[in-house]
Structures are given as structure tokens and as C-alpha cells.
């Protein structure tokens, strides 16, 4: 379908990087629109929502209501994604300001929905393939690649399988074709993502799917650097850690949300793993040269007692994660933990405050360990008038930190790409660095 080129589109992509990939697929279908950040001037306002936890749901709803208030006469307001999917039976009545609702199954049909001005909810969850055109946002050198959708885990607190369905892995060849296509356009750094990346190809009867992917990307030699997000402990193996360590392309980056360390809490959370398995994996990751380890913790899950929390706190202080996300338990419908007796909010807040102090201490230590050492980094774009924005190659975009390079020290402008840099100052959670050379 051809769309008039003078029409403007305002896209607001909420939530995770997996959501962003779906947003980029929709942009690929709406390529003839002119993108704008001004919702008031847009002919179409497209909000790709998040429905993971309560705070994300509230952000999505408020964003929709703000857009409804701002939109001009005749403009179309669309709410797509997880919130729409999760509450598709009631959301049309709850938010009548929206013109079109669609869930997680029809991102590649967004142009048709706009043309017909109709809602659409397909049963099958959409999984982006190499033939789905995407308009990559935010970088000219980095892209996300989604390797699977859905999840077969049965965590007590997580509603994702209820609206994203069972694990659905892409074919390896499709991923390789997408990587090749993006690399030819200059995207030489990629982050591979899924709800449960380490279970890639489990649904096709293959337990070493992620190892196969790493090996194939290494042989393809289309990329300079890559990393994997969202390893699940029970499907992560020492062999997988070894494959990442030995890869010339995949960075020694380990993002494995453990959620807790106490055996009794892991059982209550239905994590299908144990403290011993967690420790075996984490110790192996720490033994990898120049490894970078990120994790996620949930505080205040029903029935978390003081002893279990103290065990978690002591472990986090001892292990010293490079980065740590700490979430308060969010009671979600259609989960096992929803009806269990809750930990008081006051207790949860106090526990989070204590863990945040530990996390910040070790995060700062991780930053300072880079000072006055040459590191490999990706320079992505200009940050304001005087600085270039960069990140350590081991870091994931947006979440792990920021490095700024002062352009006054440069003889020629920097092009986005791979450079060796030396951080020299750490202040306000930002590293300042100088460039040595490209590589």
C-alpha cells in the first residue's frame, strides 16, 4: 500500500528492546510516513505498549491518555503491543480514546489496519523474520536481533507466557540472513534478544541452539561485535559460557537474571533451578577474562522472609555484579504468586533501599576499573554540541552506562563505529574518554 509522503507519524515505543524490534517492523511497513516526535502535529500516533508489570502498565496507559489529549483533529491513535494483547477483552471500553487496537500478532499488518481503520488481534504471536523490513532507530551501527518469542518457563511471578505464548524459535538461517542484510547496511554491532535466549531452539528439540548461533555468526564474519541478553539459569550451561568466551565476535557479556539466590525462594518462585546451579554458572562467568556480569533481582516476592532476604543481600555484596536491576514484586493476574500472601510494601521498600546501596557500590567499582586503560568501544552518535556518545563493547545499549568523548580533543570528526578509547574520568555515572584509534 502506498501512503502519502506528506503524512506524519509519531511512534512511541515503550518497554524492552524486544518491543523496539516490533516497533521497527511497523516502521518498515509505514516507511512513507515522515517521522516526528511531536504528537500534536502527527497524522498517526502509534504507541507500542508494555504490559509486563504494574508500573509498565500505568506508563502505557498514561502515555495513551496524553497522546489522546494532544492529537489533532482527524489524527489516528493506535495502541499496539503487550498491554493491548493482555487486556484485549476490556481495553476497548476502558480507553475509548484509542482509534485502533492491536496486540502482539499483527505488527506486519499495521499499514492495512490504518487503511481500514480497524482493530486486529491474531492468535499467533508475531515473530520478525529476515524478510520483514525494519527501520532501525537510534543508531547507524547497532541493531537488535530477536531470535525467539514466548517462553516455556513457569515462573510464579511472570505473566509473559499468558500473552506471549510458548517458546517459538526462529530458524537459524533466517537469523543469519537478517544479520547479513543489516551488516551490509553498516550495522556491525548487534545484540541478540529473546524472552529466554538460552532456550533458543529448545522447541525444535535442540538443546545447543544458542551455541549453534554463536558458531554460525563467528563463521559468517559479518559482524565486528555482538552480545546476548536474557540468559535463563536452568537452560544456561558451562558449554554455552565457554562458547561465548571463545568467540571472536561475542563479547564476554553475561546477562542472567537470577531473581534470588536462596534455595527456598527459588522454589517459591518456580525458577526450576537451584542455588548450587546459579553459583556454578556465575563462578564460571567470573572466571572468564574481562567478563561483564549483569543480573536482575526481585524483592518482596510473597513469603520472602527476613532470613532469605539476608542471604540474598550477603550474596550480592560478596559476588559484586557489574550491574544489577532490582525490582519490587508486582502482583500480576494469571500468575501463581498473584493470590499468595504479600510482603508489606514498607518492608519491600526498606529491602530495596538496602540492596540499591550494595548495587551502586559495586557498579561504581566496575566503572572505575576501566579508568586509564585502553578499551574497545562503539561510538554511536553526537551527544549534544560537544561530545560523542560511546559505550564499552561489552555493554548493552542504554542500560549499562555511557562514555562521552570531548570533540575538542579531536582533529577530525568521528564517524560512528569501533574505536579503542581510554576513559580518564568517572563522574555522575558517566565516563569521559579520549580516542586512541579505530579498529
Curated annotation (Swiss-Prot):
Q: Which GO terms describe its molecular function?
A: 4 iron, 4 sulfur cluster binding; aspartic acid methylthiotransferase activity; metal ion binding; protein methylthiotransferase activity
Q: Which residues participate in [4Fe-4S] cluster 2 binding?
A: 151, 155, 158
Q: Which UniProt keywords apply?
A: 4Fe-4S, Cytoplasm, Iron, Iron-sulfur, Metal-binding, S-adenosyl-L-methionine, Transferase
| Entry's Gene Ontology BP terms | tRNA modification
A single Gene Ontology CC term: cytosol
UniProt cofactor(s): [4Fe-4S] cluster
Record Pfam families:
Radical_SAM, UPF0004
EC annotation?
A: 2.8.4.4
Which chemical reaction does it catalyze?
L-aspartate(89)-[ribosomal protein uS12]-hydrogen + (sulfur carrier)-SH + AH2 + 2 S-adenosyl-L-methionine = 3-methylsulfanyl-L-aspartate(89)-[ribosomal protein uS12]-hydrogen + (sulfur carrier)-H + 5'-deoxyadenosine + L-methionine + A + S-adenosyl-L-homocysteine + 2 H(+)
Q: Which SMART domains match?
A: Elp3
Q: Which family does it belong to?
A: Belongs to the methylthiotransferase family. RimO subfamily.
List the protein's name. Ribosomal protein uS12 methylthiotransferase RimO
Instruction: Identify the species of origin.
Output: Helicobacter pylori (strain P12)
Gene from which the chain derives:
rimO
Amino acid at each position: 500500500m502506498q501512503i502519502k509522503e506528506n503524512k506524519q507519524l509519531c511512534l512511541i515505543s515503550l518497554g524492552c528492546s524486544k518491543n523496539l524490534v516490533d516497533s521497527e517492523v511497523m516502521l518498515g511497513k509505514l516507511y512513507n510516513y515522515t517521522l516526528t516526535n511531536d504528537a500534536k502535529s502527527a497524522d498517526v500516533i502509534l504507541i507500542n505498549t508494555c504490559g509486563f508489570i504494574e508500573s509498565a502498565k500505568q506508563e502505557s496507559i498514561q502515555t495513551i491518555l496524553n497522546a489522546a489529549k494532544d492529537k489533532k483533529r482527524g489524527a489516528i491513535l493506535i495502541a499496539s503491543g503487550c498491554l493491548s494483547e493482555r487486556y484485549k477483552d476490556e481495553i476497548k471500553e476502558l480507553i475509548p480514546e484509542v482509534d485502533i487496537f492491536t496486540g502482539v500478532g499483527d505488527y506486519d499488518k499495521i499499514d492495512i489496519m490504518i487503511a481500514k481503520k480497524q482493530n486486529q488481534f491474531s492468535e499467533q504471536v508475531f515473530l520478525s523474520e529476515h524478510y520483514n523490513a525494519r527501520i532501525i532507530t537510534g543508531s547507524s551501527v547497532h541493531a537488535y536481533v530477536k531470535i525467539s518469542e514466548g517462553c516455556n518457563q513457569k515462573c510464579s511471578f511472570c505473566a509473559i507466557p499468558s500473552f506471549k505464548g510458548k517458546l517459538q524459535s526462529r530458524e537459524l538461517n533466517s537469523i543469519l540472513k537478517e544479520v547479513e542484510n543489516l551488516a551490509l547496511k553498516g550495522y556491525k554491532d548487534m545484540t541478540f534478544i529473546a524472552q529466554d535466549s538460552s532456550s533458543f531452539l529448545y522447541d525444535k528439540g535442540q538443546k545447543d541452539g544458542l551455541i549453534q548461533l554463536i558458531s554460525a555468526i563467528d563463521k559468517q564474519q559479518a559482524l565486528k561485535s555482538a552480545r546476548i541478553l536474557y540468559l535463563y539459569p536452568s537452560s544456561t550451561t558451562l558449554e554455552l559460557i565457554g562458547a561465548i568466551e571463545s568467540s571472536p565476535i561475542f563479547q564476554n557479556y553475561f546477562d542472567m537474571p537470577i531473581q534470588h539466590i536462596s534455595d527456598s525462594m527459588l522454589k517459591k518462585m518456580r525458577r526450576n533451578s537451584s542455588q548450587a546451579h546459579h553459583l556454578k554458572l556465575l563462578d564460571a562467568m567470573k572466571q572468564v577474562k574481562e567478563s561483564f556480569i549483569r543480573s536482575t533481582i526481585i524483592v518482596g516476592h510473597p513469603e520472602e522472609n527476613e532470613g532469605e532476604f539476608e542471604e540474598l543481600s550477603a550474596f550480592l555484596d560478596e559476588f559484586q555484579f557489574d550491574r544489577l536491576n532490582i525490582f519490587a514484586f508486582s502482583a500480576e493476574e494469571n500468575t501463581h504468586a498473584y493470590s499468595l500472601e504479600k510482603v508489606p510494601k514498607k518492608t519491600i521498600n526498606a529491602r530495596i533501599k538496602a540492596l540499591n546501596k550494595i548495587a551502586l557500590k559495586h557498579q561504581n567499582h566496575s566503572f572505575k576499573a576501566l579508568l586509564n586503560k585502553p578499551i574497545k568501544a562503539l561510538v554511536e552518535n553526537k551527544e549534544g554540541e560537544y561530545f560523542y556518545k560511546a559505550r564499552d563493547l561489552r555493554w548493552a545499549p542504554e542500560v549499562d552506562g555511557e562514555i562521552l568523548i570531548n570533540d575538542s580533543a579531536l582533529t577530525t570528526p568521528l564517524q560512528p563505529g569501533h574505536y579503542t578509547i581510554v576513559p580518564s574520568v568517572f563522574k555522575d555515572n558517566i565516563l569521559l574518554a579520549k580516542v586512541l584509534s579505530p579498529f
